[in-house]
Amino acid sequence: MEKLTVIKVGGKIVEEESTLKQLLERFSKIEGKKVLVHGGGRSATAIATKLGIESKMVDGRRITDAETLKVVTMVYAGLVNKNIVASLQALGLNALGLTGADLDYMRSDKRPVKEVDYGFVGDVKAVNASLLADLIGKGVVPVLAPLTHDGKGNMLNTNADTIAGEAAKALSRFFDVTLVYCFEKKGVLLDENDDDSVIPEITRPLFEEYVKKGIIQGGMIPKLENSFAAINAGVSKVVITKADELGKDSGTVIR
């Protein structure tokens, strides 16, 4: 199978122009076929504030009411996505920006209300992997925004890590897929205050041991759960690394 790299970027990397420029330059130099998935939550919060719309969060997750949905659609599908696409075009990549509604490549169900009503948030139910694979095969570099749709005319805010994981899993039918999560740390750390304490490789038993000991906690737990789900679904390798280490043999490998 031909190799494909699916890379997810978010946080400060997307928000700061100089950092994003450097990352996209590194991304453009990665050999073979590739897909970029981006976040943009901080930009959405900043624009919402300017518009007088309060951003509500529960455990780090955005509550997406009707007004907030308008903002995240504008910011993710417009401002952030198209800036990235234009930058990649300038670097010689034939990039195409997509939300799940575009070409109906990814559908979701609106998350049911349980303890918390997250509003217009989507849980992915279907990925048109053959469509994405066809685009990739023609030399297109998909740039995926963290938005899906329900097939009934409604856009849904969807976690970028989830978009990356679901796309990687679906595309593993067509390619030998490596999934890379880029963020501000060098990888999964033994000591969150020591950026050099990177755990080079994590297996499921080691993950469970580190969770019990409190070494791995917070937002890293769902990120690793998504990583193991991707491996179980056919993704060859998952890497968690720092953005400026992209393309290097570094970070934490999940097997």
Enumerate the language-model features and the residues they cover.
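C-terminal catalytic "cap/lid" subdomain
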Residues: 1-255
